Every structure is written in structure tokens, then in C-alpha cells.
Amino acid sequence: MDFSTLFRTKENLSLDKNTLTILRYIAIIGQILAISIVFYYLNLPFPIIESYLIISMGLATNLYLQFGIKINQLKDFYAAPFLLIDLLQLSALLYLTGGIFNPFSFLLIIPTIVSSTFLSMGTTIILGFITSILLLTISFFHLPLPGEDMNLLHFPNFYKIGIIISILIGLIFLSYFGIRFAG
């Protein structure tokens, strides 16, 4: 492998701004629905206001992407920061809502998978590394899963380790697949 080409993208590798914007709106709507159902329908307490604030930051950056960025084909320089914001935003939400025990924690790999399909290998490796660090961080530092502090749930350590390993394997497998077969 020639490492000098790691961060070069082929001319045909870019992420359509409209595609990224729509994906991010889908994520935002899903996040709003998930936390609203858990808080208002299931009546499980967690930091709902902080969660809405985190989601609103994602919405603000998506509005900037949609209306502030004038180019339509996003190369690494433009797309990677938004994917990084998505990683940080979802990690913050997961921190507030149970860390890796949250059933939505596997979604943390999506920004890296998007990168592997549309951006350079170097960007994908960096996002994959950051994803791994964030995954490990929210595995050990997080607020309780809604309902966990009410003795409704208890997870042994081997289960936590299994979740970490399964998400990391999914990250590596799907990233490789995207790099290998995209473009």
C-alpha cells in the first residue's frame, strides 16, 4: 500500500451535499422521536432538555450545511467535519442515555461507513479511530440507561465487552466493504 495516496481522493469520490443533508435530517428526526417516546410515552427519566439541546446543535449544523455551503459535491475537506460533528453529537446523546447499553449505540459507526463509501481512505481511518475512542469512552463513562437506575435492567461486564467488540467488528467490516467496493 502506498501511504502517500491515503488522503487523496479520486475525482469521482465525493459526497453529494443533498444526500448528506437528507441522511442528517433522518437522524435528527429519529433522535427526536426516540427520546420523546422514551421520556413521554415510557415515562423513563433522563436529561431530556440536554438531549434536545444536543439534537438542536445537529439541526443547526445541518441547516448550515444545507444553506451555507454553496458547493454540491463535498470532498473530504467539507464532508469530514460534518461527519465528525455527527459522531460527537451522537456520542453526547449516548452519554446521556446509557452509553453503549442504549440500543441505538450501533449507529455510532454510520459516519465512518458513509466516509468509507464516499471519501478517502485516510479520512475513513481517522473517523474510524475517533469512533473507536468515542465508543470506548461511552462504554465506561455514561449516565444510566433510562430505567436502569430503577433496577429494571442489569448488565454484566461480559455483555458490555461483547457490545464493544461487536460494534468495532461492524465498524471495521463495513468500512472495509465501503472502501473496497465503492467508487
Predicted segments, located by residue:
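Generic transmembrane alpha-helix motif of multi-pass integral membrane proteins
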Residues: 89-101, 106-126
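Membrane-embedded alpha-helical segments of multi-pass membrane proteins
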Residues: 52-60, 84-88, 103-111, 161, ...
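N-terminal membrane topogenic signal
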Residues: 11-26
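C-terminal ends of transmembrane helices
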Residues: 16, 62-71
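Alpha-helical transmembrane segments
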Residues: 22-32, 81-89
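Alpha-helical transmembrane segments of multipass membrane proteins
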Residues: 32-37, 63, 91-95, 113-114, ...
